[in-house]
Amino acid sequence: MTDPDPDDDDLTFWDRHEFKFYQYGHVYAVIYGQVVIDYVPQKALKRPVKVFLICYSHLFSLVLIVVLPGYFCYHFRTLTDSVDPRLQLLLYVSFANTAIKYATVIVTYLANTVHFEAINQKCTYRRMHLEKEFKKAPKEPKIPFEFFMYFKFCLINLMMIIQVCGIFAQYGEGEKGTVSQVRVHFSIYAFVLWNYTENMADYCYWINASVLKYYRQLNLQLDHLRQDMANLKPTGMLLHRCCELSDRLEVLRRRCQEIKDLQKESFRMHQFQLMGLMLSTLINNLTNFYTLFHMLVKQSLEDVSYPVLVGSFYATGFYIDTYIVALMNEHIKQELEGMALTMRRFAEPPERDVRLTREIEHFSLELLNCQPPMLCGILHLDRRLVYLIAVTAFSYFITLVQFDLLLRKKS
């Protein structure tokens, strides 16, 4: 792929700077040992550079998974010790949150190692091929795609800033000695774990956003073809026009299958990471609810530490991040339903053209096979799942409140 012509007045801000966003994402991923993530490869890396980056990726991942957990397990009592038993309960919940991130990092590392070539061949390059196929397609679906990309980009960077502020605030307000140092180190470790898993989540989100854009463009092309078919008239060129429409419908059917395969392969390789993301969201919501309760009990914002406020904002942003990931899958499901409705509006081919009738039937059958994939064969990643997570977190929050009230009576 080549950079767009900057002299074209019709280019949007995204068209002019798209590859800069992708390069930023690639560098951001490489820093955290995710060399496999290259959104739009421009040129092949030299073999020594590629070997170095792969070795760095494995070394960085093993330090996160093996070395640092041993250090924090050794200082477990230091991390969770507190004079205030209610604060200690909050520390336990935060530790559980980081443990979920740690498990997600392990799954992500194993998935990246096993599917290293598949991620490039079955996702990245297949997406590039589809981008070329839809280059002359209607441009309207690009507007929401660009909006979601901007929103995701701003949200992720804002969450990074919030976490860095929280680390500095914890360092500034913490007590002197080993306790403060270990907790600051643990906060930095949790920040790196989040970045590690977020890289793959962003890549999966980008693939799903692209799938949604392609389905919308395909639906518009399909609707235009339906209108052309409805305008057919019994003239001498009728059979020729039917052959042209059959060819166009066959091309659209192949594109639909390619889009389905792209989403299916991406979901298959990232389903365990997405499951970890859902569990992290559950624990984050639980932490957020309990933090707000902690604030209300004190009845004064002046008594609430700055790191607690930052953590609350971060958990809210994390929930929004998970929601838009699920929302993308919800939109894909709705677009498939819209395409099925478009196919049902197709009129009976004139002169009962056999090939055109067959292509309509094949396309309808193809849409029946385009069912949204499930997480580990258990759950659909949609808004209902995010709502279920929020309700479950609130239920666990009630249990935590009961423990909190019990601790208040004892203290």
Which role fits each region the language model picked out?
Residues 2-59, 159, 235-411:
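Terminal membrane-anchoring module of integral membrane proteins
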Residues 105, 125-132, 213-220, 254-257, ...:
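Generic structural signal for well-ordered, non-membrane alpha-helices
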Residues 2-21, 98-115, 214-242, 343-344:
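Short, non-transmembrane cytosolic segments of multipass membrane proteins
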Residues 106-127, 201-218, 318-346:
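Inner-leaflet juxtamembrane helices
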Residues 31-41, 45, 114-142, 173-178, ...:
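Short N-terminal secondary-structure initiator segments
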Residues 117-125, 159-170, 211-224, 261, ...:
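Alpha-helical membrane-embedding segments
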Residues 56-110, 129-204, 223-238, 288-317, ...:
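Helix-loop-helix junctions within predominantly alpha-helical proteins
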Residues 199-220, 225, 246-259:
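Loop-centered beta-sheet repeat module
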